[in-house]
């Protein structure tokens, strides 16, 4: 449980520190290890945001679309839909 939270927050911290590439990788490692975590939708959303910050909009779009498909009722999916409209 602690490792799960630590891995998630490490990815968030990288994003907050503008280390976007590290954020994408760390959050993917978190998702791969804890695919059923309640934080997966948030992790995918932050990956998309990190990719946008890296000017990798096409990749970000794929992450947002995946989020909307896999977690359509999540708050993050609603935000992802807004990001796709921009």
Where are each of the predicted segments found?
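Acidic, polar-rich low-complexity tracts and alpha-helical solenoid repeat scaffolds
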Residues: 1-86
């Amino acid at each position: 449980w602690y490792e799960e939270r630590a891995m998630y927050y490490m990815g968030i911290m990288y994003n907050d520190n503008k280390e976007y590439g590290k954020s994408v990788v760390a959050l993917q490692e978190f998702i791969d290890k804890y695919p059923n975590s309640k934080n997966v939708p948030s992790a995918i959303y932050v990956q998309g945001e990190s990719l946008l910050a890296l000017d990798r909009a096409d990749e970000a779009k794929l992450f947002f679309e995946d989020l909307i498909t896999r977690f359509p009722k999540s708050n993050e999916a609603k935000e992802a839909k807004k990001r796709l409209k921009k």
